[in-house]
Amino acid sequence: MIKVTSAEQFNTLLETHQKVVVDFMAVWCGPCKLIKPEFERLSTEPEYRAIRFAVIDVDQVPDVSEKAGIRAMPTFQTFENGEKKGELLGADPNKLRKLMDELARV
């Protein structure tokens, strides 16, 4: 799990990893706290080992969050070869797993 702290780090992450999932969250966000353990658990599952997991605090890296079009937290975005492939707004564990399955299959 990578904690992204700058736009440069985010861009490098997308350039150097084929598949990436990003959790755009905020420390004050209740639903973000509820889904965090599930996101962390998914990052350790064998079927997702080819995917790089990252977290961005929208208050600490607002430029990346704004560029990504984040309107609510949590928002999960998936990327393949630097291009956005999917998005999930909200803290639904079943939908998060479905999003991960879609990225893992690509």
Predicted regions and their residues:
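N-terminal leader/targeting and pre-domain segments
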Residues: 1-20, 98-106
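Short pre-active-site segment immediately N-terminal to redox-active cysteine/selenocysteine motifs
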Residues: 18, 25-28, 72
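The canonical Cys-X-X-Cys-His
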Residues: 29-32, 76
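Non-catalytic, surface beta->alpha helical segment in thiol-disulfide oxidoreductase systems
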Residues: 72, 77-106
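Conserved acidic residues
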Residues: 57-59
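Mid-chain, well-packed structural core segment of small domains
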Residues: 62-71
